[in-house]
Swiss-Prot record:
Name of this protein: Protein NrdI
Annotated family: Belongs to the NrdI family.
Function: Probably involved in ribonucleotide reductase function.
One Gene Ontology MF term: FMN binding
GO BP annotations listed: protein modification process
InterPro entries: Flavoprotein-like_sf, RNR_Ib_NrdI_bac, RNR_NrdI
The species this protein was found in: Streptococcus pyogenes serotype M28 (strain MGAS6180)
Pfam families in the record: Flavodoxin_NdrI
Length: 162
């Protein structure tokens, strides 16, 4: 896979935007307003989570991201998802990632809290580089890229094919 970019959504708080800037990778932002975005290249999706916490997962995936992914062309180019969240919200921490991963049948590659740490930046850069330059079979590629959740209140997650 030669061409790969980051596609991300960030609200007006710009937390996800600041994280993506630290990556130093080619990126396109999903607009906050209703302007459409269509991509024609493979991408990793980075998305924040908006959920109330506890067992309330309603609204976890931002509406702008749903609109973006409702475009079949955009869906077909997604190669994986990375999500952010706030551990104060317990079980809904970074929940947008697993939701999108399951719906699109793409791997959940990483989850990070708020603005992310220097370690999160390095992990995402490494995931991006490995996916961009990987030439082995697709399933092996997916299995090698999947990482465990690092937050202590979560059990390790593995992507499973159905």
């Amino acid at each position: 896979m030669a061409e790969l970019i980051i596609v991300y959504f960030s609200s007006k708080s710009n937390n996800t935007h600041r994280f993506v800037q630290k990556l130093g990778l080619p990126a396109q932002r999903i607009p906050v307003d209703n302007r459409p975005l269509e991509v024609s290249t493979h991408y990793l999706l980075i998305v924040p989570t908006y959920a109330a916490g506890g067992s309330d997962a309603k609204g976890a995936v931002p509406k702008q991201v749903i609109r973006f992914l409702n475009n079949p062309n955009n869906r077909k180019h997604c190669k994986g998802v990375i999500s952010s969240g706030n551990t104060n919200f317990g079980d809904t921490f970074a929940l947008a990632g697993p939701i999108i991963s399951q719906k699109l049948q793409v791997p959940l590659l990483h989850q990070f809290e708020l603005l992310g740490t220097a370690t999160d930046v390095k992990k995402v850069q490494a995931i991006f580089a490995r996916l961009k330059h990987h030439t082995h079979d697709k399933q092996k590629q997916i299995n090698n890229l999947i990482t465990e959740r690092t937050h202590p209140c979560h059990k390790p997650m593995r992507h499973t094919s159905h």
